Amino acid sequence: MNKKIKIPKDSKAINYKTTDLIREFISDRGKIIPQRITKSTRKKHKLIEKAIKQARLIGLMPFKQKNW
């Protein structure tokens, strides 16, 4: 679970369109990985959470993983 995730310094790079980036912040079961594990700041983690939730609502990402 302790995988190294590279967080971009530019906060504009974190949005719902960058699904490749925000998929790294989701666990195998489809849950958002906590801030203490990803080592991201509070501000960046809020942006990541918001982007994941927006992508799920639009349909770019699934709410649950299929194999669970």
UniProtKB/Swiss-Prot annotation:
PROSITE patterns reported for this sequence: RIBOSOMAL_S18 (PS00057)
UniProt signal peptide: none
Keyword terms, alphabetized: Chloroplast, Plastid, Ribonucleoprotein, Ribosomal protein, RNA-binding, rRNA-binding
Subunit structure: Part of the 30S ribosomal subunit.
Molecular function as annotated in GO: small ribosomal subunit rRNA binding; structural constituent of ribosome
Protein name per Swiss-Prot or TrEMBL: Small ribosomal subunit protein bS18c
Gene Ontology biological-process entries: translation
Taxonomy of the source species: Eukaryota, Rhodophyta, Bangiophyceae, Cyanidiales, Cyanidiaceae
Species, as recorded: Cyanidium caldarium
Membrane-spanning parts: none
